[in-house]
Each structure stands twice: as C-alpha cells, then as structure tokens.
Amino acid sequence: LTCVTSKSIFGITTEDCPDGQNLCFKRRHYVVPKIYDITRGCVATCPIPENYDSIHCCKTEKCNN
C-alpha cells in the first residue's frame, strides 16, 4: 500500500507502508480558525481523534491525499 505523507504546491510525497500497516490516514489538527496542521502516513489501526483532531482512514492507494 502506498500512502501520501505530505502535499504541497510542488506535488505529493508518498511512502510504501511497511508490513502490518495496511491503512492510510490523514489527521487534521485545528490550530486557529481556518488553519489546520495536517499529518498523513501509514498506520496499523486508525488513530482515535484527540482534542480538535479530525481523522480519516482508508485502504486504497494514495487515498489520504
């Protein structure tokens, strides 16, 4: 499985997930109004949202774009 790790105006950076990590995730952490810190990558299980986080998990190639 290939997941997106970062995204910018120059394109996306991806990683091949290691064995046992068969989900891609995208975490949006609320910082201030209209500003989010976004983290992407591979995980074995979908993380539980904390505080002001929004988490999306998926199982297809680059689905966390």
Swiss-Prot record:
Source organism superkingdom: Eukaryota
SUPFAM superfamilies: Snake toxin-like
Tissue specificity remark: Expressed by the venom gland.
Keywords from the UniProt entry: Disulfide bond, G-protein coupled receptor impairing toxin, Neurotoxin, Postsynaptic neurotoxin, Secreted, Toxin
Cellular compartments annotated: Secreted
PROSITE patterns: SNAKE_TOXIN
One function term, GO molecular function aspect: toxin activity
Disulphide bond pairs: 3-24, 17-42, 46-57, 58-63
InterPro entries for the chain: Cytotoxin_Cobra, Snake_3FTx, Snake_toxin-like_sf, Snake_toxin_con_site, Toxin_cobra-type
GO cellular component assignments: extracellular region
Record function comment: Highly potent on various alpha-adrenoceptors (ADRA) (subnanomolar affinity for ADRA1A). Order of potency is the following: ADRA1A (Ki=0.37 nM) > ADRA1B (Ki=10.47 nM) > ADRA1D (Ki=104.71 nM) > ADRA2C (Ki=165.96 nM). Were also found to reversibly bind to muscarinic acetylcholine receptors (CHRM), but the affinity is much weaker (CHRM1, Ki=1778.28 nM; CHRM4, Ki=4466.84 nM; CHRM2, Ki=17782.79 nM).
Other remarks in the entry: Negative results: does not bind to muscarinic receptors CHRM5 and CHRM3.
Family stated for the protein in its record: Belongs to the three-finger toxin family. Short-chain subfamily. Aminergic toxin sub-subfamily.
Protein name: Adrenergic toxin rho-elapitoxin-Dp1b
Organism name: Dendroaspis polylepis polylepis (Black mamba)
Species classification: Eukaryota, Metazoa, Chordata, Craniata, Vertebrata
